[in-house]
């Protein structure tokens, strides 16, 4: 029995997040090149664990990932990863080219650029980030995008680091390539539309 859903009768609104990798020379928090590795030179193993928030609570999604008790193996290639990606060295200053590109996106979308841009951390312990969190910055808010005669509002524009590349996920071991980890990307959150 086939049925159709009518978005108007459901009062359905849908918002989109657009993620775009930036074609910068270097990664977001180090001087490594943004290039895909053909082969990997070294590897290391980690088990990521959740930590309490400032309020003393554990993130439910982090607890769910932790319950899987997976081992994570990271593959690294010289030139496209360093101690920053391995979480063995503090991140460097934000790459100027990536920040300037995010500001250009913001101005093109008529968004209000923040007076100060701070690096925040989002908990991620599925193995796709060696540190257990993703670094992200709110660059601008508001604005709009005109598409096919319709104006779509922009909620926020963030500059963040991309996740490591999943190579395999077998028998309780996830393997990731660090060549993609830290590549800058812009995240544009659009307002819901009917």
Predicted feature residues:
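Basic, nucleic-acid-interacting segments
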Residues: 2-194
């Amino acid at each position: 029995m086939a049925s159709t859903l009518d978005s108007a009768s459901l009062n359905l609104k849908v918002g989109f997040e657009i993620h775009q990798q930036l074609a910068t020379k270097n990664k977001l928090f180090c001087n490594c090149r943004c290039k895909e590795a053909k082969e990997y030179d070294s590897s290391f193993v980690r088990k990521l664990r959740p930590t309490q928030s400032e309020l003393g609570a554990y993130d439910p999604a982090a607890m769910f990932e932790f319950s899987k008790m997976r081992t994570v193996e990271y593959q690294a290639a010289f030139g496209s990863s360093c101690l920053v990606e391995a979480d063995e060295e503090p991140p460097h200053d934000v790459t100027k080219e990536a920040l300037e590109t995010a500001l250009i996106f913001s101005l093109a979308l008529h968004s209000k650029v923040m007076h100060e841009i701070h690096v925040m951390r989002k908990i991620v312990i599925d193995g796709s980030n060696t540190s257990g969190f993703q670094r992200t910055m709110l660059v601008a808010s508001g604005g709009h995008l005109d598409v096919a005669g319709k104006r779509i509002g922009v909620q926020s524009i963030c500059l963040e680091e991309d996740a490591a590349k999943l190579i395999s996920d077998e028998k309780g071991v996830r393997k990731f390539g660090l060549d993609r980890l830290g590549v800058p990307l812009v995240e544009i959150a659009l307002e819901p539309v009917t």
